[in-house]
Every structure is written in C-alpha cells, then in structure tokens.
Regions:
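Trafficking entry modules
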Residues: 2-140, 145-195
C-alpha cells in the first residue's frame, strides 16, 4: 500500500508541471489557431497553410499576436532572400540581354523587399505602448510595398522582351506569405507592462 501511495505521489509531482505548462501554452496555441482561422476565412487549405507556415517556428505555440506577426514577416523575409539568391544564380548564367535586364530589375525589387521586411519585423517587435501605433503603421506600409515586388518583377520581364518571368512560383510564394503576415499583424500596439 505504501508503494502505491509513493507511486501516486511521484505521478502527481510529474503531472503538475505538465498541466501547468499546458495551461500556459493553451491560450497562445488558441491564438495561433484563431489568427489562422481569420486569415483563411473558411478556406481549409489556407488555414492549413497558415498553421504549417507559422509552426515552422517552434515558438509559435507560445507567441502573442505581435510575435506571430513578427514570425510571419521573418518567414516572408527568408522567402525573399531565397528568391534573391535564385535571381543571382540566374543572372550568372543568363546570356540574353533582355532577360538579363529583367533579372536586374527583379534583383533590385527583391533586395528592396528584403530590406523592407527586415524593417517591418523590427517595427512589429518594437510596437509597444503609445508609440507602438506608429511602428505598426510603418510595418503595414512596408508589407504593402513588398506585396508589389513580385508583380513589378513580372512586368520587368514583359517589358524586357515579352517573355514570362522564371520566378513565377517564387513570386507567388512571397505574395502569399506577405499576405499572411499582413492579415495577422495587430492593428493596435500591445500595452506595456509596468514592473
């Protein structure tokens, strides 16, 4: 009987931290699901994309609204960096002048997108208290500017010779992840907590 009580006590002690951790993680996990439901607006593939994209960062389960937006922006920045690297590889091998011009225009757009997304992530991370509204507006503006980068890249290829962009899939991916970041971006700064 004493062994059974001791075993029960050990089980209880092991269970308490797990239950406490679950209670702390649940609201943020719910926030992740709530934000993805709003983003998807009833479209299951969009919801799955949102969850899959944000869960790439293991901190997403415990993140607040601002943290989720910053994660989405960092993921968008990584997408833009990868596309910029692809553009650089294509530029090295391109011999047709019109396509080189198109790639040069795309390189400029994606370099600007990388800078803007970096600034947007910093703005969201700093958006606390009364001054935070300005940072959130700036982040929204930067995300809106980045949303146009893929289309400008496509237009550059059309102008350069009427050929389609070799970056269509990458362009669509950037627009989708920037759209996700825009949709989950908080509209108001978080209140600052006093120590």
């Amino acid at each position: 009987m004493a062994d059974h009580q001791a075993l029960s006590a050990v089980f209880f002690l092991l269970l308490v931290p797990h239950v406490a951790w679950m209670a702390m993680a649940m609201p943020s996990s719910t926030l992740l699901h709530d934000k993805c439901e709003l983003y998807a607006a009833g479209d299951r593939p969009s919801y799955d994309y949102c969850i899959r994209t944000l869960r790439v960062d293991s901190a997403s389960a415990a993140a607040d609204e601002r943290g989720l937006a910053a994660m989405a922006i960092r993921i968008a920045r990584s997408t833009a960096v990868a596309t910029a690297a692809k553009i650089a590889r294509l530029q090295r091998g391109e011999t047709v002048p019109a396509r080189r011009d198109g790639l040069a225009a795309c390189a400029a757009e994606y370099a600007a997108a990388v800078r803007r997304l970096g600034r947007a992530a910093r703005d969201v991370s700093r958006s606390r208290g009364a001054a935070g509204a300005r940072e959130l507006r700036e982040a929204q503006t930067l995300l809106a500017e980045v949303t146009g980068a893929p289309e400008l890249c496509d237009v550059a290829f059309e102008v350069a010779g009427g050929q389609g962009s070799p970056l269509d899939a990458a362009d669509r991916e950037l627009d989708v992840v920037v759209g996700l970041a825009s949709d989950i971006l908080p509209t108001r700064p978080m209140a600052t907590t006093k120590p």
